[in-house]
Amino acid sequence: MIGVDSKSSSTTFIETMVESEKTKHTCLRLEISGADPIFVKGTWHNSRFDISVTDGSSSWICNATEEEVAERAAQWDQPVSEYLKLAEQYLGFQQPNSVYSFSDALEGSKRLSWTFEKEGTKLEWRWKCKPSDDSKKITVGILDFLMEANIRLSEEVVNKTRSFEKMRSEAERCLAQGEKLCDEKTEFESATYAKFLSVLNAKKAKLRALRDKEDSVRVVEEEESTDKAESFESGRSDDEKSEEEASKKATSSKARGGKRAARS
């Protein structure tokens, strides 16, 4: 199935605008059980739709008017917009759970039908398609639409492939840049850590030198203090000895003086 919004493309099916109405086109290769595939092209308006059908040799058309669509929608208790949306869903995309049929009707007409479920009930919609007055024109129109759509799809694939390649190239560039930044970050952290260790070790060495210097000064001060104490003790001992000797001499003199007095 190929679905195309004609507003965004320049197909042979020109978009028509009536009171800001946007026309959409769809084309479905419809597989029908027990029959050859058919192509169903739909043109969807806000309140009506047109269908062209071809099996390759013959073609049929169904031009559903606003009145007919409104009547069908009323029969199913649906708003027109909801009815058209559901019809486009089933004729724009083959639904796997739906049973499609394209059976004979009177006067060479065909009856296009499809089934769907609503609230557990299986329902069927039918639309009568009349023989086209110009089967060749209808068939060629559908083929042109398919070719135009395939060209647009091919261009989209090419553009998306280019965009993907560009995105992949950008992603690879970003990845390489990210890896480079990661390496630079690791290198910076390693250099910073090495510098930090160098500064830390230098400070530790300086602190050790200061401690050693303080220890040396303290040892010298302690030695000097010890020397002074020993000198003081030595001086004190000499004084005490002098005093003792003087005291002994005085005592001895007194003793001798006493003896002289006694003799007198």
Swiss-Prot record:
It is found in: Nucleus. GO terms for biological process: DNA recombination; double-strand break repair via nonhomologous end joining. The keyword Zinc does not apply. Induction: Slightly induced by gamma radiation, but not by white light or by UV-B. Gene3D superfamilies: 1.20.5.370, DNA double-strand break repair and VJ recombination XRCC4, N-terminal. InterPro entries: CbamoylP_synth_lsu-like_ATP-bd, DNA_repair_prot_XRCC4, XRCC4-like_C, XRCC4-like_N_sf, XRCC4_N, XRCC4_N_sf. GO terms for molecular function: ATP binding; DNA binding. It comes from the Eukaryota. May be involved in DNA non-homologous end joining (NHEJ) required for double-strand break repair. May bind to DNA. The LIG4-XRCC4 complex is probably responsible for the NHEJ ligation step, and XRCC4 may enhance the joining activity of LIG4. Belongs to the XRCC4-XLF family. XRCC4 subfamily. This is DNA repair protein XRCC4. It comes from Arabidopsis thaliana (Mouse-ear cress). The gene is XRCC4.
